[in-house]
């Protein structure tokens, strides 16, 4: 069956997989299953940094997921959205709360070094786009909001 998507590309956004020992945020498929499906149906995979991290409770998870999708040729994009082990103004520990980077939210595991490492791995893995999605304090000015996004952009260290 052929579909005309008028240039749009279907992408699977990875969310945390179901792990019986922990309360899921989404509880969907594993990255390995999503990569297999994406390869089979010729669609891309988007890695949401925070969702990979909260799944494994480790900043290394996002990097590992980026590498895995890149090796299979299905890595389409990476969105930087933080996560962390502590309760913050954005929610409980390990919430899919789109925490800002560590420079703006110390409890976030999304440090400048992790952003750079993952951005570089994504580019090397054939990624088509990088993005950022984060919550901001409700009273943040426009300048503060833009500064938070700029911190992520600069941490990518794009050349």
Model feature map: region roles:
Residues 1-41, 145-151:
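Active-site acidic/histidine proton-transfer and metal-coordination neighborhood
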Residues 3-5, 49, 94:
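A residue-identity detector for tryptophan
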Residues 12-14, 46-49:
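Short beta-strands and strand-loop turn motifs
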